[in-house]
Amino acid sequence: MAQSELNAANLALRLVGNRAVLTTLADATAEGYACTALIDDCKKSLLRMHPWNFAVKRKKIIPYQDVAVSDVTFVSANLIEVTHTATTYVAGNYVTLTGIAGATVANGTWEVASILSTTVTRLTTVDIPNIGTLGTYTAGTTDYIRRSPAFDYSYLYALPSDNIRILSINGDYDLDAYRIESGFILSDDSVLEVRYIYDVTDYTTMDPLFYQCLATYLAYNLCDHLTASDGKKNELHVYLYGGQGKRGIMPQAKFVDGSEDSLQQMGASEWVDSRGSGTGLM
């Protein structure tokens, strides 16, 4: 049977011992409601537990761009427009302006408020009153109240929108080199090369062992909603994590996945994760 969100839910129901077969996760049944409520959270939890190879993504984040004072138009006390080389900025990105000699107060980290064209971006910040000649404020433009970190680090980056877990930044696994706080990456580096676990939505790309673990983990959580049997829940716990002289499918899946990486490709924490037995639910 093809791997899909719906088929994973139906597999979980079979593991619970439920005879229902969902035709869609939107089925107006107790089984449909329970699966819809739980499956995405179960998937994200399992993705965070291990650096699964199928879920690793790389992204380069470059917030820096040199601009001249002639490229900057002051719109209001905390809003500017910048003309620049074409980029793929989107609202919510953070960018850093540097080298603006004639309006040094504009240098720093700003948040993208809106994209006016491929080469004109409207940026916003706070706590800079009267930074230049005020222009006409565009009604409806959203002002944000975030900017660079108050101390310790030079730059603040939004986490990738599909991030589940950061593995390394610029090849560094040392947390002193960066921090993850309030959904942002704090770093002194002006360019970030990020390796991270992303939120996999295409079930066909999932490792088959992970897919089996997901169905089992979902079944374990469904027990509280669909059955009063503690025995079934304990049985699924043993099947997933091991115990009672049995080896669970989760430790096996982690071991197989980890065996496909060399130590040179993995950080110390990833190596430990890949071989951890995972004896309890997280």
Could you describe each region identified by the protein language model?
Residues 1-68, 141-282:
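Glycine-enriched, solvent-exposed interface loops adjoining structured elements
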